[in-house]
Amino acid sequence: MNDVATASSGLVQAAARPNLVRINLVGLSTIVRKETRRVVRIWIQTIVPPAITMTLYFIIFGQLIGSRIGQMAQGADGQPISYIEYIAPGLIMMSVIQNSYGNISSSFFGAKFQRFVEEMLVSPMPGWTILAGYVAGAVMRGLMVGVIVLGLSLFFTKIHLYHPFVTLSTFLLAAVIFALLGFINAIYARKFDDIAIIPTFVLTPLTYLGGVFYNVAQLPSPWREISHANPILYMVNTFRYGLLGVSDIDPAWAYVVMLAFVVALGAFCINLIHRGVGLRT
């Protein structure tokens, strides 16, 4: 009798697994579609502003100031790299970072504010599905903006692609890292003003001090050593290495740093969801 009951229980569990997988896939795809449609629906807020901002950066720093600076480094092909060529990868990465972060922080906090996040929490979807859906939506916006800024940069300078895998993987890792950070910000935020605190006082300074506009190797000590504590430095330089073949730091070490951030932040976000921090009232 016990054998029959055990066998029946096993059959029920085996039959339930495909249903759970299907539920997870449906939930994940639904969140991703919702986030993508949101970005496209309000494109004048999500796509146009960063495009205008980066165009101004290219004009002011690249054309007006960059023409007076001259050569910044020597490329992988032995050709000199002008200032506008040097900052172009950093500006692309800056747009990816800011938009990946901003998308998920505002979207998930909106879900909290409108209280429909509670419906997701009581659904059969596990926490990682909710997190993956919102992160994928943020990465999608980062991809859209990054491609647009890349296209705009072609009006001001030529863009190389020396290491396609390095370029794409760095883009994805950076977008995921700052999407996870934006998720944490949305979790702890209690009002809409809290969403702007981290980008204003943390994200913007780290971005400007992350080697976007200058070569970190040229900094005097101890500022050069202090700059290596900035995680954005590793993303910007690895992305620059993928496009231009030059970097201030070892790309292998940069990958270690970025992967460590993805694992640590991902685990922390899932833990926050399971504990219901900032989600359950």
PLM region descriptions:
Residues 2-11, 64, 243-246, 256-281:
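Junction motif at the cytosolic side of a transmembrane helix
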Residues 10-51:
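Aromatic- and glycine-rich beta-strand/loop motifs that create alpha-glucan
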Residues 41-68, 87-97, 204, 257-263:
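Hydrophobic alpha-helical transmembrane segments of multi-pass membrane transport/permease proteins
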Residues 48-53, 191-210:
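Pore- or pathway-lining transmembrane helices of multi-pass membrane proteins that form conduits
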Residues 53-60, 82-156, 182, 200-201, ...:
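Hydrophobic alpha-helical transmembrane segments of multi-pass membrane transport proteins
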Residues 61-70, 98, 153-161, 189-191, ...:
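Short helix-capping/hinge motifs at transmembrane helix termini and TM-loop junctions
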Residues 127-199, 246-270:
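Alpha-helical transmembrane segments and their short interhelical loops
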Residues 207-264:
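Membrane-interfacial helix-loop-helix junctions in multi-pass membrane proteins
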